């Protein structure tokens, strides 16, 4: 028996869904959506789910992750019910129920929690740097002397390990919600065989390209690739970044670093300007966590660039101070965004497509064996 929560629509307002009852279920949004299909129909179906309070059905659905907010539904809705923003609010809500720590729901529904969390992590990072930094050399810039790699590297690995464990455990909870009540048994071998689907969609973000205006795919790929390159460089090639030596600006590692910085600064700056101007349908409404993500990412990339400039100019104190501030922005960005809010979408979206593909393949196998003739892909 389907459970109904009559207060669900009000609950979802805190996640950004403000106009759900303006929808009269005409279906225009689903008709113009280039990503909807016969098996995965949205946004209208989910607007209706919210109106009816079908919280449990939403909790076990994969479709909100298959929506990439192209913006066509926003532009064509005759009631201005903002169906794209509703799907965005559902993704925030689902992120909060996958998270077992309870921090995600607090960050999404309380600006006070959000701001205090950033401030506490920022100040705590500065305090740690103050307590553990090495000698301050003023004759010339010695960044590794100020921030010894034997401290920075293990701290980064532990920090990254903790965040990875939290995110992976949340992904497992996502799996349990979406795949827990299966009508088709999925062979264990399929999980390995379909890993290519997961890797492909994570690396290419190709589903963005299915939107009628695929410029967002290019921007999103630049953002994702810039972050991925920066992450790999910092973790695998730190000896070239956290060093007392002055590498040539044409060193391959430096060039990759420039690409990552330019990509991150370009996309975040463009997104901030677009949100301020409300120039695109997807930027007409901004949740506080959208701003937190963009501002922290921009400041992290910009201070990282300043560290490089000051070091290249051999300005010791500006280099050390800016490096400390850079870390102080990086920690809340990663600690809050990766497992709990906006950045988690980078994991949930490709995993959602992976889960859908697993269901499709399992159904094909069962049909070939004379089993079920159909299955509800959306769960």
Each model region followed by its residue ranges:
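Flexible metal-binding regulatory segments at protein termini and peripheral loops
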Residues: 1, 91, 95, 379
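Ferredoxin-type iron-sulfur electron-transfer modules and their immediate structural context
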Residues: 1-64, 346, 360-363, 373-377
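Iron-sulfur-cluster electron-transfer modules
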Residues: 20, 37, 47-239, 243-246
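Charge-dense polyanion-binding interfaces
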Residues: 250, 260, 361-379
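Helix-loop boundary elements of multi-pass alpha-helical membrane proteins
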Residues: 207-209, 277-281
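Hydrophobic cores of alpha-helical transmembrane segments in multi-pass integral membrane proteins
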Residues: 116-130, 155-173, 193, 197, ...
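Hydrophobic alpha-helical transmembrane segments of multi-pass small-molecule transporters/permeases
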Residues: 28, 32, 72, 76, ...
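Secondary-structure capping and boundary motifs in well-ordered enzyme cores
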Residues: 22-25, 59-62, 66-69, 258-261, ...
């Amino acid at each position: 028996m389907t459970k109904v929560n009559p207060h669900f629509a009000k609950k979802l307002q805190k996640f950004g869904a403000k106009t759900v009852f303006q929808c009269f279920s005409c279906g225009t949004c689903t008709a113009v959506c280039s990503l909807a299909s016969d098996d995965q129909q949205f946004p209208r179906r989910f607007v209706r789910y919210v109106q009816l309070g079908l919280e449990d059905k939403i909790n076990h659905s994969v479709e909100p992750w298959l929506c990439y907010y192209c913006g066509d539904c926003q532009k064509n809705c005759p009631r201005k019910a903002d169906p794209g923003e509703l799907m965005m609010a559902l993704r925030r809500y689902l992120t909060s129920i996958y998270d077992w720590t309870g921090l995600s729901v607090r960050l999404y529904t309380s600006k006070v929690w959000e701001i205090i969390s950033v401030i506490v992590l920022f100040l705590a990072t500065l305090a740690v740097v103050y307590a553990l930094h090495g000698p301050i050399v003023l004759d010339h810039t010695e960044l590794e002397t100020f921030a010894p790699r034997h401290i920075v590297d293990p701290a980064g690995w532990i920090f990254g390990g903790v965040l990875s464990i939290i995110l992976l455990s949340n992904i497992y909870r996502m799996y349990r919600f979406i795949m827990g009540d299966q009508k088709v048994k999925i062979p264990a071998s399929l999980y390995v065989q379909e890993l290519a689907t997961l890797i492909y969609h994570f690396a290419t973000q190709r589903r963005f390209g299915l939107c009628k205006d695929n410029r967002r795919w290019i921007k999103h790929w630049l953002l994702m690739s810039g972050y991925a390159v920066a992450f790999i460089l910092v973790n695998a090639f730190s000896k070239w970044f956290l060093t007392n030596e002055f590498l040539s600006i044409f060193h391959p590692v430096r060039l990759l670093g420039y690409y990552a910085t330019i990509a991150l600064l370009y996309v975040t700056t463009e997104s901030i300007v677009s949100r301020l101007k409300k120039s695109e349908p997807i930027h007409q409404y901004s949740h506080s966590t959208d701003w937190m993500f963009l501002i922290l990412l921009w400041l992290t990339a910009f201070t990282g660039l300043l560290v490089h400039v000051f070091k290249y100019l051999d300005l010791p104190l500006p280099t050390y101070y800016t490096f400390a501030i850079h870390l102080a922005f990086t920690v809340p960005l990663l600690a809050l965004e990766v497992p709990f809010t906006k950045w988690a979408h980078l994991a949930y979206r490709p995993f959602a497509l992976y889960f859908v593909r697993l269901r499709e393949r399992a159904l094909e196998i069962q049909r070939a064996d004379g089993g079920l003739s159909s299955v509800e892909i959306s769960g």
